């Protein structure tokens, strides 16, 4: 270990010892109950798995989301995530263990404690605060440490996301029989990103291992391309940086898509619930799906889509008037 990673881990060791004094294991260990949310099962299946992350800041970007509200974030993520990751590191990510029960109380998915875990105490603490899984990084742990920590996690019915960043760590993960392996595309030694890491390492993992691609995923195109190599993705910064978190999640997970020809409120609601970002309103009288301005208002009030006005051979004045009156997000012109 060196540079950024070594500094973080050294500071984490100091934090752990201080927290043990502040909140001794003996003070809460008897109150810890095993998890009932199955992290491993949540990532299985034919569909791509998404671990969506609650992250306020990072060493590479600084503060990512000023109005960080874990309850609001969980309320959005619960409609899309397979599992939810919560940063608990205080110094470098402005996280907190207090965020775990907030997210767990709102979202029914398994909650992953994302931290630099080097001591069994941290796993007990994570479960006490309602985490259902934890991250174990082979870049900071030797095999014996990993075995000890994963045994503690499994004894509490918690899942383990085993993180690797190179071939050596991947071989270790296989030898250690890791069930879920996260390939970190970020080099924590210098914070650089290389998506080729997923392309190169994932094929080395057998069919019995769930592969998660971590870091640097910020578009639907990347998700589609890398889904040939990975079973799922851990995504945080790409969404946390956007004011409209709901739309950001949809863009990355489902892509930019439009459902056109909306004429009824229930159509708009169905489109939104299915993941659409844009809703098309046709202002062409000859179209069987044409709407009046009054109908358009009712449709728009039914669901928070970004609405697109569709026109054919319309005058500039007409397009401008309807766009302004309805506050359309975009127009689509034909003719």
Model-derived regions: residue spans:
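N-terminal amphipathic alpha-helix/helix-capping segment at the start of soluble metabolic enzymes
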Residues: 1-60, 246-262, 266-269
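Active-site beta-loop-alpha junctions enriched in small/polar residues
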Residues: 11, 55-57, 89, 116, ...
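Short, well-ordered coil/turn segments that N-cap beta-strands
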Residues: 46-50, 80-82, 107-110, 131-132, ...
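Active-site mouth loops of central-metabolism enzymes
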Residues: 51-69, 110-118, 160-163, 213, ...
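N-terminal active-site wall of soluble small-molecule enzyme domains
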Residues: 61-154, 169-172, 198-201, 284-335
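Catalytic cores of alpha/beta
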Residues: 118-130, 165-176, 213-235, 240, ...
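Glycine-rich phosphate-binding active-site loops on the catalytic face of alpha/beta enzymes
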Residues: 128-145, 182-192, 229-252, 276-289, ...
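C-terminal helical cap(s) of enzyme catalytic domains, especially alpha/beta-barrels
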Residues: 195-205, 227, 239-260, 293-302
């Amino acid at each position: 270990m060196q540079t950024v990673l070594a500094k973080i881990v050294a500071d984490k060791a100091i934090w752990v010892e201080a927290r043990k004094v502040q909140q001794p294991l003996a003070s809460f260990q008897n109150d810890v109950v095993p998890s009932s949310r199955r992290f491993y099962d949540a990532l299985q299946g034919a569909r791509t798995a998404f671990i969506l992350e609650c992250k306020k800041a990072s060493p590479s970007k600084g503060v990512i989301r000023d109005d960080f509200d874990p309850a609001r974030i969980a309320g959005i993520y619960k409609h899309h995530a397979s599992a939810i990751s919560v940063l608990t590191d205080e110094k470098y990510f402005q996280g907190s263990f207090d965020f775990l029960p907030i997210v767990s109380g709102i979202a029914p998915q398994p909650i992953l404690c994302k931290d630099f875990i080097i001591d069994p105490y941290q796993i007990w603490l994570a479960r006490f605060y309602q985490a259902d899984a934890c991250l174990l990084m082979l870049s900071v742990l030797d095999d014996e440490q990993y075995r000890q920590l994963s045994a503690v996690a499994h004894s509490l019915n918690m899942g383990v996301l085993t993180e690797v960043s190179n071939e050596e760590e991947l071989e270790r993960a296989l030898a250690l029989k890791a069930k879920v392996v996260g390939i970190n595309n970020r080099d924590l030694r210098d914070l650089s990103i290389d998506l080729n890491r997923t392309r190169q390492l994932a094929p080395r993992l057998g069919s019995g291992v769930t592969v998660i691609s971590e870091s640097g995923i910020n578009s639907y195109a990347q998700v589609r391309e890398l889904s040939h190599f990975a079973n799922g993705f851990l995504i945080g910064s790409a969404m946390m940086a956007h004011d409209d978190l709901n739309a950001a999640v949809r863009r990355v997970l489902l892509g930019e898509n439009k459902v056109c020809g909306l004429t009824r409120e229930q159509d708009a609601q169905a489109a939104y619930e299915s993941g659409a970002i844009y809703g098309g309103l046709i202002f062409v009288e000859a179209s069987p799906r044409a709407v009046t301005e009054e109908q358009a208002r009712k449709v728009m009030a039914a669901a928070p889509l970004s609405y697109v006005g569709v026109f054919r051979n319309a005058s500039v004045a007409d397009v401008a008037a309807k766009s302004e009156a309805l506050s359309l997000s975009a127009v689509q012109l034909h003719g």
